[in-house]
Amino acid sequence: MSAMSSNWNRRSVLRAAMGLAATGGLAACGSNTGRGGGAGSGVNLVQYFHAYGEAGTEQAIKKYAAAYDKAKVTTQWITGTNFESKLFSALLTDNAPDVFEFHPQIQLVKSGQVADLTDLIEPVKDDFNQADIASHTIDGKIWGVRMIDDPQFFYYRKSMLEDAGIEPPTTLDELVEAAVKLTTDKVKGVFLGNSVTPVMNPLIWSTGANTLDDKNQIAYHTDDVAAGLKKLRTMFKEGHLLLDAPADWWDPSAITQGLVAIQWCGMWAMPVIQKALGDDVGIFPFPTSADGGKPAVTNGGWSMFVNAKSKHLDEAKEYVKWLWIDQKEYQEDWSLSYGFHIPPRTSLAESADKLKSGLAAEGVKLFNEYGNFDNPAWTQAMIVALEGVIADSVRKGGDPEAALDKADKTVNRELKKLFG
């Protein structure tokens, strides 16, 4: 694996917390907690970040922290693919981070693990993407500050589609047909990730359904979703999907190295893909899968939270306010200088020249028109349950209805825990 692939492979693309009862040795995070010694005002803060794949990200985060003069801020840059287990193990110890990045999760709030940040965000709330505000609002309070928005969609090789005489698919049926025509003895048609699970939610959204409804009840178990799973199975069974790629879907190397014609990936990879392929690349959303449905984009991203149990709670909140509310220059740098991410601050997104033209502008358009944001009630156990649906029905060829029934039991059990 190349150095670039190794960097991208460390990107742990997480969608939810594992729960605060997570176990595991904190030693895996490294013995240096940053609590002792060093210069500064006498207050030591520790922040946790997962290891981003984009070059320069670690140096940037540490540069921002070094510029803060009211406390000494130490960064724990967590490598590996189990950032969430290391983070939540650490949160149960005396060496827990004061500040950490993650995704909005209702368990964090119900357990009292994260601090209410409403007072920080309220004065600038109107300058944030309102969907981000909504996804971080639980019980009328705002619990995290969004740092970056990361839309996910399909990249495709224009030349390969042109040679096959096809247009970018607008329906799931067309994607299945395209996979057939694009597959050769050297190139596979489509890459949906080694597990195929990254497109489970987009499939649901593209039928017009959702994971949960407004009453926090199951909304994904529909005939159209079951039919869509059968179509994914067709691509898998017929050998038109790239499987067991050296690097998974968040790494753009499958398409940049010519292993596949169409790849599901994120906007963060756009500069790398364009550098490798030039103008021979386009993008499109997950295509419509049913009558009444519409194309779908996953609007992922990362947010900053404050540990409510921090010994330096006020200082931690002040640092988060300074960096992720006040320092718009750093926020823009973080979003646009290391891969492409959409700034959650509306004023920054609208003024970002790098996002105003070409493929980046198309990505922003897909984000705005077809994006689906985090649902904080959708827990890790629920995510795993739907990953099981893909495993059982797409990879193993089982009955989609039976697979969905199996998932329903887990999801309903989780919903009962959360909402009674």
Predicted regions mapped to residue ranges:
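Hinge/lid segment of periplasmic solute-binding proteins
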Residues: 103-153, 167, 176, 282-284, ...
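Conserved C-terminal helix/tail region of periplasmic/extracytoplasmic solute-binding proteins
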Residues: 3, 162, 368-420
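Glycine-centered hinge/linker elements that transmit conformational signals in sensory
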Residues: 179, 217-245
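Extracytoplasmic/periplasmic solute-binding protein
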Residues: 32, 143-147, 152, 173-224, ...
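C-terminal lobe and pocket-closing loops
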Residues: 105, 268-279, 289-385, 418-419
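A structural signal for short loop-to-beta-strand junctions that line the ligand-binding cleft
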Residues: 98, 125-160, 188-189, 293-296, ...
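Conserved N-terminal structural module of periplasmic/extracytoplasmic solute-binding proteins
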Residues: 2-107, 168, 290-292, 314-315, ...
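Short, solvent-exposed loop/beta-turn-alpha elements that line the ligand-binding surface or hinge
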Residues: 118-130, 209-227, 274-276, 285-297, ...
